[in-house]
Amino acid sequence: MEVKDANAALLSNYEVFQLLTDLKEQRKESGKNKHSSGQQNLNTITYETLKYISKTPCKHQSPEIVREFLTAMKSHKLTKAEKLQLLNHRPVTAVEIQLMVEESEERLTEEQIEALLHTVTSILPAGPEAEQQQNASDDVAMDEEDPA
């Protein structure tokens, strides 16, 4: 097998999640579960990938959210790969942005990094672990206020 164009398209984690979920549903509906070693390997890869991706923020994204995010990112001077990393990982700190944006110290001011963070956190939904952390911190705050 030969790769003709390695960078024909970049896929977000959301797109991979949707593709694999649809593929899994199609196989389930058609009832085709061949037990060849190649099919078993594909099933394993699909399962492991879906298991991993379902723990990331992309599980809570939609085509509208992705479109809105990419439209909002046009004002920022970032490469496609950098936008994709921001979309996939949903950074919440300046350090995370600096890790994802190449040469961020030279390319971005602190205000631009804060603007990026605001764009990311306001458009992209938080993952389940972020919601759990928020709920836990809310519970702690309520306990401190009401020591009944």
Curated annotation (Swiss-Prot):
Keywords: Antiviral defense, Cell membrane, DNA-directed RNA polymerase, Immunity, Innate immunity, Membrane, Nucleus, Transcription. Residues 125-148 are annotated as: Disordered. SMART domains: RPOL4c (SM00657). It is found in: Nucleus; Cell membrane. Pfam families: RNA_pol_Rpb4 (PF03874). It is a peripheral membrane protein. One of its GO terms (biological process) is defense response to virus. Signal peptide: none annotated. One of its GO terms (cellular component) is DNA polymerase III complex. PANTHER family: CALCITONIN GENE-RELATED PEPTIDE-RECEPTOR COMPONENT PROTEIN, DNA-DIRECTED RNA POLYMERASE III SUBUNIT RPC9. DNA-dependent RNA polymerase catalyzes the transcription of DNA into RNA using the four ribonucleoside triphosphates as substrates. Specific peripheric component of RNA polymerase III (Pol III) which synthesizes small non-coding RNAs including 5S rRNA, snRNAs, tRNAs and miRNAs from at least 500 distinct genomic loci. With POLR3H/RPC8 forms a mobile stalk that protrudes from Pol III core and functions primarily in transcription initiation. Pol III plays a key role in sensing and limiting infection by intracellular bacteria and DNA viruses. Accessory protein for the calcitonin gene-related peptide (CGRP) receptor. It modulates CGRP responsiveness in a variety of tissues. Component of the RNA polymerase III complex consisting of 17 subunits: a ten-subunit horseshoe-shaped catalytic core composed of POLR3A/RPC1, POLR3B/RPC2, POLR1C/RPAC1, POLR1D/RPAC2, POLR3K/RPC10, POLR2E/RPABC1, POLR2F/RPABC2, POLR2H/RPABC3, POLR2K/RPABC4 and POLR2L/RPABC5; a mobile stalk composed of two subunits POLR3H/RPC8 and CRCP/RPC9, protruding from the core and functioning primarily in transcription initiation; and additional subunits homologous to general transcription factors of the RNA polymerase II machinery, POLR3C/RPC3-POLR3F/RPC6-POLR3G/RPC7 heterotrimer required for transcription initiation and POLR3D/RPC4-POLR3E/RPC5 heterodimer involved in both transcription initiation and termination. This is DNA-directed RNA polymerase III subunit RPC9. It comes from Bos taurus.
